[in-house]
Amino acid sequence: MIGLVLAAGAGSRLAPFTDALPKTLLPVDGERSILDVAIANLKHVGLDEIAVVIGFAADRIAERAPELERRHGVRLELVYNPKAEEWNNAYSLWCAREAFAEGALLVNGDTVHPASVEERLLASRGEELVIAVDQEKPLGDEEMKIHLTEEQLLGRIHKDVDPAGAHGEYIGLTLIEPEAAAPLADALEATWQRDPSLYYEDGFQEFADRGGRIGIASIGTVEWVEVDDHADLERAREVACRC
């Protein structure tokens, strides 16, 4: 099993900081970037082989890779997404299908959280995929919400899930077991071929609709933030200094 970080996005709502810099490289704790936090968390749970999907301003991450390897004691594999500025992240994750073929712990490259989330995921192994879910946070219309089946498996994942009936928010971390790799890659391919603007969570829905089993790991009362805009970045800096 490897660590896998999706870091191909541009982060247009964080301009001008991201005009020529991937948002995953934005500093959140001194010189530590969002990507530093993600790599450190994966290393903390014993994953020192890490693939990073790059796209927008890919050269900036490639330039930083040797320093990141030295700092964290890991080996990085860079996976290039040539459509990162045109298509959404269902294609981005599909680009990493060879990297996650033997299983992976997937982390969104714009999420700041403590390593306890990775620990929870690894402690919750059992299904083909396991997604990290915040079941404490009040939900609105913009969150990537989930609804569970009677078996406590993922039934639906989408922003349009009714907040009143939702069972939590997916926070951007997933454990992919080796046996799920090929069917997940197929589901992701079907998803981006249907509509390249779709998210990888739509690929998860396709995987579940085909009979794939997706469990959850409830993260408990944990501070985390998905960095989409300047307000998120300020909050990420508060969270990162406590990670």
Q: PLM features: what roles do these ranges have?
A:
Residues 1-19, 26:
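N-terminal nucleotide-binding beta1-loop-alpha1 segment
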Residues 1-3, 167-243:
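Conserved alpha/beta core of the MobA/IspD/sugar-nucleotide pyrophosphorylase nucleotidyltransferase superfamily
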Residues 2-5, 32-103, 194:
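Conserved N-terminal catalytic core of the sugar/cofactor nucleotidyltransferase
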Residues 20-36:
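Short catalytic helix/loop segments, enriched in acidic residues and glycine
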Residues 24, 75-77, 153, 213-215:
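Conserved beta-strand segments of alpha/beta enzyme cores
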Residues 25, 146-148, 216:
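A structural signal for short hydrophobic beta-strand segments in well-ordered beta-sheet cores
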Residues 69-144:
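Conserved beta-loop-beta/alpha segment of the NTase-like Rossmann-fold superfamily
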Residues 114-193:
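Conserved core of the sugar-phosphate nucleotidyltransferase
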